[in-house]
Curated annotation (Swiss-Prot):
GO terms for cellular component: membrane; plasma membrane. Residues 14-26 have a biased composition (Low complexity). Expressed in seam cells from the early embryonic stage through the L2 stage (at protein level). It comes from Caenorhabditis elegans. This is Facilitated glucose transporter homolog.
Length: 516
């Protein structure tokens, strides 16, 4: 890595010149291969129906992230009572906190396993079938979590969190890929962002349900976990009417006629020959003997650098610190002087603002003047500046300057909003734009697994580090967001509206120019 940085410092050409040179190189190569850009398509009612139905699976992910915040203390008290009734032992507060921490972390453990398996399942059984049967895990988890108090058996919560982690892990690898494979090239960003949009909606709803006025009581908290069955049943009712990915049908089943029929239905017209030919050409270029079996081939040859970039894009999302703010937002607000139910209200309010910002990203991500790269760099840069200001205002607040507490809340808001405009939605579907049909499933699985690993690491380490160095813990995120912003600027091409082959050529050219 040091060698790469050193070579970057020696590079005397400006990035803009390099980028234009790269684009010219790619365009020339595309013309030589007789590739033409696909015509822009519009939203159709059926495309919107399919995208909305598929993205319902993402609701589970966001709900499980947000639902544990408010009722956590209530569940810990119940665990202590339940343990005494089961085993006749009195748990200390530390022991009860540890059991609850294990239950919370099992979500990430399940997510790692589920995301790693998602590529195999998607390629073996198809995108649609995998998504359909994945709902079984969600329903089993909902039963375990919501009836744990009824049966007075807290290990059901631990097991339920693992099951729902498996479900969400499969979802995180499958849904962004499925969405972008159904979308036309000019709408890939909008369609891919539905994954993060549903996560944001679910986080807000779960936090609202956890308020004391609704289900945030000793009697009501099991109903929070039962609510996740609603979108699960809704998807079970709608997904059978959706279509399979045409790219999957061509690359895995060689069923061009069915792929054509699906494209005509999605696009709302019969002029799909050009798009179908692009899919066939993509398959012909990429379906070649792989010398390394399974996932190993992703880290060999032409796949190696795109896979590394995909993983680092996922790291840029999680190491930005958004998980720390999401998991511990109530605690952060309490330390800022908010009391009573005010921290919970503030957390719900922030979730609503983040949701609005995610909606804003939908309109910018495919805009000619923005695209993925600029939004991602802008988001990381905004988070970098916000994290510095959070540290400054927390320091002033601790020194007795009460006005700084209000400024701190403002900068946390800035931190969350800038995340929603780039690092939130973009990494999820970025991998699907880099890889072709033959390797997309496995690549999406590996990148999603890296996201879960990073999420687990941040959730596990932030609170202990924060207890030691206090507000200066946010300087970690300053370093990471700055580093990943530079990385995106130097090594990540714009993917908006481009084919995987064109993107990979530009990616290879950028790497060669910078590292030479």
């Amino acid at each position: 890595m040091n060698a790469v940085v050193a070579s970057q410092n020696k590079n005397d050409r400006s990035f803009s010149n390099m980028e234009s040179e790269s684009s010219s190189n790619v365009e020339k190569s595309e013309k030589e291969n007789h590739h033409q850009s696909l015509p822009d398509e519009n939203w159709t009612p059926f495309l919107f129906f399919c995208i909305s139905s598929i993205a319902l699976a993402s609701f589970q992910d966001g709900f499980q992230i947000g639902c544990i915040n408010a009722p956590g203390p209530l569940i810990i008290d119940w665990i202590k009572k339940c343990h005494f009734e089961l085993f006749g032992e009195v748990l200390s507060q530390y022991q009860a906190d540890f059991i609850w921490s294990v239950a919370v972390s099992m979500f990430s453990v399940g997510g790692m396993f589920g995301s790693f398996c998602s590529g195999f399942l998607a390629d073996k059984f198809g995108r649609k079938s995998t998504l359909l049967y994945n709902n079984i895990l969600a329903l089993l988890a909902a039963v375990c979590l919501s009836t744990s108090k009824l049966f007075n058996f807290y290990p059901m919560i631990v097991f339920g969190r693992f099951l729902v982690g498996l479900n969400c892990g499969i979802t995180s690898g499958l849904v962004p890929m499925f969405l972008t494979e159904l979308a036309p090239a000019n709408l890939r960003g909008k369609c891919g962002s539905f994954h993060q949009l549903n996560i944001s909606v679910a986080i807000v709803l779960s936090q609202a349900l956890g308020l004391p006025q609704i289900f945030g009581t000793q009697v009501g908290w099991p109903y929070i976990f039962a609510c996740v069955a609603i979108p699960t049943f809704l998807q079970l009712a709608t997904i059978p009417f959706c279509v399979e990915s045409p790219k999957y049908l061509i690359s895995k089943l060689n069923d061009r006629e069915e792929a054509r029929r699906i494209l005509e239905k999605l696009r709302g017209h019969t002029k799909v020959d050009e798009e179908l030919e692009h899919m066939v050409q993509e398959t012909m270029v990429t379906v070649e003997p792989l010398h390394q079996p399974g996932y190993v081939s992703l880290f060999k040859g032409d796949n190696q650098w795109p896979m590394i970039v995909s993983i680092l894009m996922m790291f840029s999302q999680q190491f930005s610190g958004i998980s720390a703010v999401t998991f511990y937002s109530t605690l952060i607000f309490k330390r800022n002087g908010l009391s009573g139910n005010e921290p919970m209200y503030a957390t719900v309010g922030f979730g609503c603002i983040k949701l609005i910002a995610t909606f804003g990203c939908l309109f910018l991500i495919d805009h000619p003047k923005f695209g993925r790269k600029r939004l991602h760099i802008a988001g990381l840069s905004g988070m970098c500046i916000s994290s510095i200001l959070i540290v400054i205002t927390l320091t002033l607040s601790n020194a007795g300057y009460h006005w700084a507490s209000y400024m701190n809340v403002l900068f946390i808001l800035s931190f969350v909003v800038t995340f929603a405009f780039g690092p939130g939605p973009i990494p999820w579907f970025f991998t699907s734009e880099l890889f072709d049909s033959a390797t997309r499933g496995r690549a999406a699985a590996v990148s999603a697994t890296s996201n879960w690993v990073a999420n687990w690491m941040v959730g596990l380490t932030f609170l202990p580090i924060n207890n030691i160095i206090h507000q200066y813990a946010f300087l970690m995120f300053t370093f990471f967001t700055f580093t990943f912003a530079i990385f995106t600027w130097k090594f990540v091409p714009e993917t908006k509206g481009k084919s995987p082959s064109a993107i990979r050529k530009e990616l290879a050219f950028m790497r060669k120019r910078i590292c030479s």
